[in-house]
Amino acid sequence: SGGVVAYANYTNISGVVSDVDITVTRVNGNWSSVGGVAGRLVNSNATNCGNEGTIHAYQYVGGITGYATGTITGCYNGGAITGNGYVAGIVGQTTKGVTACYNTGSITGAGNYVAGIVAFASGASASVKNCYNRAYVESTGSNVGAVVGMTNNASAAMSNLYYLDFTCSQGIGSAKSTAQTATAKTRAEMDSADFVTTMNTGMAGTFGSSRYSPALSWQTDLIGLTTPTKGNVNLDPFGYVDENDVELLRQYLVGEIELNDEQLVQADVNTDLDVNQSDLDLLIQYVAGTITAFPSVDE
């Protein structure tokens, strides 16, 4: 299943941003190969695509695609992704290259191979380059990483990979080579102009500046047009306020995750200097369209 196409074969998908929420329930068979743009990307490429929808399935689940044998370039995920195994912000499993991609959506698994960008990079031709993850990655299984869950070949190229330092305990869950690494960055480092330069290493002009962290250059004309003053709990570069922010705030209030200082400012939607159930209730109403603005505590 996919937000745009279920099975892409010998085709190219470009310039597509999906905002479709997907829940696939297992009835008689596997509820697998699910993506925000394409369920499976076979001998096909995805370029300059994005996902803002929430996705829940069993395995091979990704913000862009669940499974790929083609390249993925210049893509991002801002949606919350949940599943069992092979769950990631960009692709569940790939045998080819993933380049210049980033993730800001929370990733939650219950099994093995879970990551912010690529859950499983399979084979010598798989590569992950110039990518970063800024969201929590959690699973009770093994091979869990902020950027890559697992590589199974020492020749798979991993370079210029970064993640926000508190989002996961390790950048790559299991690597076949000491050269396959990802580097932790602080929030201040990710928000800096220097980090934009770092992300553009070897591919000048691919990333541009946004309010919180590097965004892809094809996005920069849109960034800021939808930015509200409050509610952007996941610090999405576009400034979207949606179900992903509701879920992060819910997790914070029940003690499942921590929020950093800037996220707490965004979560305090009624500006009473306290993040609590009242903020969550208002955020839910805003996302549902019941209210069109956040009231101040003084109103």
Residue ranges, per PLM feature:
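Predominantly extracellular beta-rich ligand-binding scaffolds that present long acidic/polar faces
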Residues: 1-229
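Cellulosome-associated attachment modules in secreted, modular CAZymes
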Residues: 223-299
